[in-house]
């Protein structure tokens, strides 16, 4: 099947978004509207127009999303072409660039990447070395403050010179936070290591301080596409802007009514103000929801780009809201309702139900309620394979072999 045959599978709004390539574009799309399909087919369309695969940069937020998109593109264009695309998460793509340009920022090209656990371990040792009260300088708080600083492009030097931040730390009774940040960065550099936030910070510094390097990648990436743009933070947004502000060959896809990562620094204004940043930006709205019934499609958020979201499915059951007085009552009610719909109504199998909870800590009481009623269930998620103690030990040995200077 060629690209044109794939385009015939799209509705009119989707097709318009895919074939437009005359300037910057914003695809505003709700859940279930086919925005990933649009991004995938747009890449395939650009390849058909003759763009070399290595000149297309596609940024996603998860490895799973990147993998699925690459598989879909491979089905259209062939595996060899799909493999040559620059497609991946912000962190994976920019770590690749930083390894290529490591000499400009004072890091070895084989620098280690610290995950959240490695970062916490190093911060814990620094807090202990400084003989600070860990009930005041709480590990999670310290890590979060440093992460927020980096995502706002505030280096430890800038942090020390920022009167507002220093005063805020004094008022919060954590005046030595800037010293922890300084020691943390010094130890990372000494070990030849970066954490995830450094990958974004250092890429911005690289592009800011080395115009020739920025120019090289501006010319190299002839088209940039970004998924889930509403979840970008300041550092990510600025990198994309630096790469695209001159040629304007950019397409971002996002849902302005769905921003759930503000605690990580995500800024909804990045998508709301996109049209003002790029002259001549075209906005495409994917308003048809293929996933949900009409009663699930909600359009009451006023702070978003105007669009009429609709579903062609039947109305379905109305959404019901239950307020419980305790977590135990919540678990009991959920289990009882599942039992009622499965047993008494007889319309559903247990596999038709899904329970979503905000934190993993909530699962215990829900599991207990399900077990009491003999309802079978399966937990999805849990501890990542790479977070298991024994796996992290093996990875640490590999790190020592690859980078002997990493003593952390």
Predicted feature descriptions by range:
Residues 1-109, 113, 215, 269:
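P-loop NTPase Walker
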Residues 3, 8-19, 23-27, 38, ...:
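Conserved helicase NTPase motor core
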Residues 42, 68-76, 93-97, 122-126, ...:
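Alpha-helical scaffold elements adjacent to nucleotide-binding pockets in ATP/GTP-utilizing enzyme cores
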Residues 23, 51-55, 81-83, 246-249, ...:
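Short glycine-/polar-rich loops that comprise or flank the Walker A/P-loop
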Residues 21, 82-84, 103-198, 221, ...:
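ATP-hydrolysis module of ASCE/P-loop NTPase motor domains
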Residues 93-101, 257-262, 291-292, 381-402:
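Short alpha-helix plus adjacent loop in nuclease-associated cores
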Residues 27, 31-39, 280-282, 287-376, ...:
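Helicase P-loop NTPase motor core
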